[in-house]
Amino acid sequence: MKQFAHSFALAWALALSPFVAHAQVAVQANPDHEQMLASGDPRAAANKRLVYDFWREVFEGGHMELADKYMAESYIQHNPNVATGRAAFVAFFSRIAKSVPIEARVKAPLVAVVAEGDRVILCFVRTAKDPKEPTATYTTTWFDMFRIEDAKIAEHWDGAARS
């Protein structure tokens, strides 16, 4: 009887688990940017800082005149909406970005900055409209990955779809 009760309880738990397993934990930004930029590997720390400062100054700040400080001329772009090459990046973003004062920190809600070898990944909180509930939103993540070569951003990937 005891084994039956245990089996019955386990069956109930398994039957209810699909409802519990789909409850999302909201994605949270990490407020400690300096901790995310730190690394025991000097090369990883330098690569993280390069990408972080590029994001702050060029991407968020709209200062396209600083692109050559951060990006290789032969920059390879894997986002389907932006052509390859530093000049193409600058031309594209010059049309849509306005120069604003450069902030001391990345404004977008960062979850993590990860470096491995010549790659750096920025992970962000992304808030999206819930397709099942038009008045609701949910959080998810967005990733941008960069390859560094000769202390410049040489290549970029993200999850963008063609628009």
Identify the role of each PLM range.
Residues 1-4:
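Positively charged n-region of N-terminal signal peptides that target proteins for export
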Residues 6-7, 159:
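Short amphipathic alpha-helical "recognition" segments used for binding
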Residues 7-18:
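Bacterial N-terminal signal peptides
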Residues 22-163:
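C-terminal and inter-domain tail/linker signature
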